[in-house]
Amino acid sequence: MSIGQEFDDGTVVIQAKRRWTELFMLLIAWAIGFGGWVLTELNINHVLPDTWTTVGGVWLAVAVVAHIFVRIVIPYADPVILPIVFTLNGLGLAMIHRIDYIPDPHYHRMDAQALWTALGIVLFVATLLILRDHRNLQRYPYVLFIVGLVFLMLPLVPGLGMETLGSRVWIHVGSYTSQPAEVSKVVLAIAFAGYLVDNRDVLSRAGHKILGITLPRARDLGPIAVMWVATMLVIVYQNDLGTGMLFYGMFVVMLYITTERVGWAILGAVSFLGGAVLAYTCFGHVRVRFDSWLHPFSNYTQNYQIIQAQFGLAWGGLAGRGWGLGRPGMVPLAWSDFIATSIGEELGVTGLMAVIVLFFILTARGMRTSLGCRDDFGKLMVAGLSFTLALQVFAIIGGVTRLLPLTGLTTPFMSQGGSSLIANWVIVAIIMIVSHRNRKPADDFVATVPAPDPQQAVTGGTR
């Protein structure tokens, strides 16, 4: 316990660090993920392999190591975030392990994903150790903006970018492949926050009123125009609707939060929809993507993936087929783009809804961290990063259920892919650093205030 905030009536809130609560929830997260791995082995092979204790021990050790660093470096951080992320990451590992058995047990995607998980946690810890004050990131918004756009456009460079399944979102260096847009996701959120905080007064100025809605001034449209052009380039030349929607949506939401003007949000939505209609009219591959969404059964061969995903979700029903008892391998890319369908088939609608609830809680804790932040830059940066995770999940679940066109985005922490997993672990580190600063008592207050009267002390919750 430590002294926290003093209110006007003299009441002192004692902020609990809540690290033991975090450790207890991490044990539950470990049991859920490793339990899925165990049930997969029992349902498929009817016996556990000799390595099961090693797998479980390493799985648990990784969680404990991350907890120890959080306890030492950011002891006041939100105690709920890390267990939720470990639960999602563990479920993803267990499902990828299950899919490795299709059609035979010769694939080792889980081994690769486990290594990426370990590397992600290493970078999570490194971020905690290096970024002691998130406000240092505010110094270079324009440099970060340029770096983010460069990474976003790298797949268009001849000889470096590579096209996979119709989308040009990968780069390859030797035998290593990566999605640089995942780096851009973090860098641009930080750059947007720095730029918008510095230019808030200018961007908040009112322009003309149309239908009762105050629109921004024409001279202030430069930033949103740049992002619109970048988004259209991604959609048209990289054939990646998901990434374009993700970045443009993140920028417009952060712009709205900064200015509190509905006109920016409406202008952003209208311009994105207008660009999408223009791309649909002018480019054949964009029309194919939308036609597959609206009329999937008109071409069974072309739309095989989304059709099988619908069948898989229907076969899973409410309770699911059980770990290792479904047929998720009928859906191409069941371990990456369509891992949500695999979860829905084997764990049912109930399991899929539980995963969605976990993402909702994760986003809510991020937004709570944003609201409690003491500086505008941190508030906006955390809101942008949290919204990015929420929008990504919405696009994925909407795609596999045909609420939206397929976007090609991956489920955070669950889908196979090193770039996405590492970037998301860095996002979690940044959010937890800010939450630590929010809940940590001010040094000058701790140094000068006497011990509180026990009758005035109130135990703090899991802020």
Label each residue range with its predicted role.
Residues M153, M162-T177, Y256, W264-V355, ...:
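Hydrophobic, glycine- and aromatic-enriched re-entrant/interface helices and adjoining loop segments
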Residues G57-V62, L115-L123, E345-A364:
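Hydrophobic alpha-helical transmembrane segments
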Residues I3-G4, F34, G56-V70, T87-M95, ...:
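Central hydrophobic cores of alpha-helical transmembrane segments in multi-pass inner-membrane proteins
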Residues G36-W52, I68-Y76, R98-P105, I130-R135:
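Short, hydrophobic transmembrane alpha-helix segments
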Residues S370-G408, M414:
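Loop-to-helix entry and N-terminal half of a specific, functionally important transmembrane alpha helix
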Residues I3, F7-V13, I397-R463:
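A juxtamembrane structural motif centered on a specific transmembrane helix
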Residues A218-T281, W293-H295:
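Hydrophobic alpha-helical segments of polytopic membrane proteins
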Residues A77-V85, H108, A112, A126-F151, ...:
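Interfacial loop-to-transmembrane-helix boundary motif in multi-pass membrane proteins
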